[in-house]
Amino acid sequence: MLYESMETAKKMRYILNMSPVLNKDAMFSDGTEYYRTPVEPREGDTVTIRFRTQRNNVDNVCLVHDGEYLEMKREKTSGSFDYYTAQIVMGKDLVRYYFEIHSGLVTCYYDTNGVSTRHEERTEFEIYPGYHVPEWLKGAVMYQIYVDRFCNGDPSNDVETGEYFYIGDTSVKVDNWEKVPAVMGVREFYGGDLQGVMDKLDYLQELGVDVIYLNPVFVSPSNHKYDCQDYDHIDPHIGRIVEDCDGLLSPGDSDNSHALKYIRRVTDKRNLEASNKLFQELVEEIHRRGMKVILDGVFNHCGSFNKWMDRERIYENQEGYEKGAYVSADSPYRSFFCFQDQNRWPYNPTYDGWWTHDTLPKLNYEESEELCRTILDVGRKWVSPPYNVDGWRLDVAADLGHSNDFNHHFWKEFRRTVKEANPEAVILAEHYGNPESWLRGDEWDTVMNYDAFMEPVTWFLTGMEKHSDEYREDLYGNSEAFIGAMKHHMQSLHMGALYGAMNELSNHDHSRFLTRTNHRVGRLSYAGAEAASAGINPAIMREAVVIQMTWPGSPTVYYGDEAGVCGFTDPDNRRTYPWGKEDQEMLDFHKRMICIHKAYPILAKGSLEFLWNDHQGLSYGCFSDSEQIIVILNNQDQERDIRVTAWKTGVSRKEATAFQRLMLSSGEGYTEMPEEYIADAGILQVKMPAYGAMVLHHRARDKYK
């Protein structure tokens, strides 16, 4: 026959273009609750899996899992679609599946890549029995706070100029809240603290925040605090100082054993206990308001000031503290670190540093069971009473240890320890690249979503690399690249991980998104601070916020983004929050989009389908069986007409369907003024303004008459 004699390439073109005989665009399934229930099954659960086709368009559909073929039953017909179902029972092991569709002589396949003429194992759907991500995280609106730059609620705990010596100079107290951070600003302190966070909880609640993610808060000599000095205590400089003294360093003195004021502040048990108590009170108040809080866990490395190392000899003669590993070969912490020269004590400087940084000693887990137990105790302590934090964000989590095998072993133990103490605590990892091997239900819950959110969004809308280090014309407005990147990287995230993934536009490691809208390559060191806000386009920022608030996952606002803060990458991205000088339009827009995100749960847990795209243009839908939200983006600098295939979200192809506009943003501002748009035969015709973003909504009862 004709089909049987075709070459493979011709068969592929034949299959993909033979509509209406076989409508590939109508085929759909995913891992959401609308196409797989339960979404996160346990061993022994019966799982119902669904598949959608065009009505009366296929002969049969088979669910293929682990080599077994199950013919699916047509469960129902709704509108223009048929829905097929099959059930499988979960065992202990991973289940992989895909769909095989037959129509006449044609056979095609459906997996996480969509329709294909050839089955590939690497793109099959996967279910890990027992994989569970806390429900409260899924779709939660998160807010990241870099504490020193957010709000100064207690000036009495401010770091003083000359209080101690760190990386080439003494600490600096910045008196001007609006001053731009210095290029080498790691030892600059603006005075933000936990009392300031407490004072602004009304603001965060009004904004619509569900979860507060705090950058590190433990004792540390830097403002970023990724160089931990004491994992058991909140830094009194952002907590409470109840015992103080004189004793700043003399000019030219770099010996921190003379830094008496600093030593008193960070080693006196009364200060440490008072600071922990303040943190406890903060968490209690956050919980009282119905919000959650996540801490930053920096467990790959610590700081050279750390009491286990004590390179600065801060703890050497303090009552109640053991000798640090730098100080003495007999230190109980010697095995916590790897020393290259065993003959250099006392004061041995030959320890391994993370990326060779001597201020960041690499923790030597494989050689110290005691270190492993200690860090596991830290993980348990802060999610347990009386602190009761709601989870951990794990810094450079894949770097921990010296081998992949140990890394996975440790995170399994960490998860077991944390979840036993607080089953609803979340474990969220910083990770670049494919996280799949950590996301199998026994290590991390989810990740900071760089690959499947931040990077594709910034390339598409701005053409900029996320540090503002590169501009690429070939990726600016390239919707095909955006869709390809999203589909590819989302395959690595199972539904629970995707629902809880931290979807950020900016953070403490990358340039502010608003700065990226000026398409300018630059850093503070050579471009200057003013260049970060020159030529910015707030309308593109609003487009990004629309995506952020309508994409599966947990939209995470980096403090100040909502207020219009600009900045190149670290340290310029750590400017202070501009209290009283916010970009009010940008702030109000964030509030309104957060309201939309929270009012329509399908934005957090619905199915996602791309509906239309071209250069500088994109549309996608979030939908269930009875509800649809369509997002349309025009990133061009001129108005244009756009035709969107709304029927792919499940609306009728035969009857007119009314969509209500929830939001329209453009270069002129934004409006929530209601307006009705009619999808005729499943097609929406929309005139989109320049740099426009539109959000449309339809429920089954809104059918146009």
Predicted regions, residues:
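Glycan-association/targeting regions that enable binding to alpha-glucans and other polysaccharides
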Residues: M1-G139, Y143
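Hydrophobic faces of well-ordered beta-strands that scaffold small-molecule active sites
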Residues: V141-Y143, I212-L214, V293-L295, W392, ...
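C-terminal beta-strand-rich structural cap/linker in extracellular carbohydrate-active enzymes
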Residues: R55, E676-K705
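Conserved, mostly hydrophobic/aromatic
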Residues: F51, I145, L204, L214, ...
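Substrate-binding/active-site clefts of carbohydrate-active enzymes
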Residues: V147-D210, V217-P386, F414, E420, ...
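Aromatic- and carboxylate-lined catalytic core of secreted/periplasmic carbohydrate-active enzymes
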Residues: P578-L611
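Conserved alpha/beta catalytic core and glycan-binding cleft of carbohydrate-active enzymes
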Residues: F305-D310, G379-R380, P386, W411, ...
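Carbohydrate-binding surface patches
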Residues: P38, D45-R50, L611-V651, Y691, ...
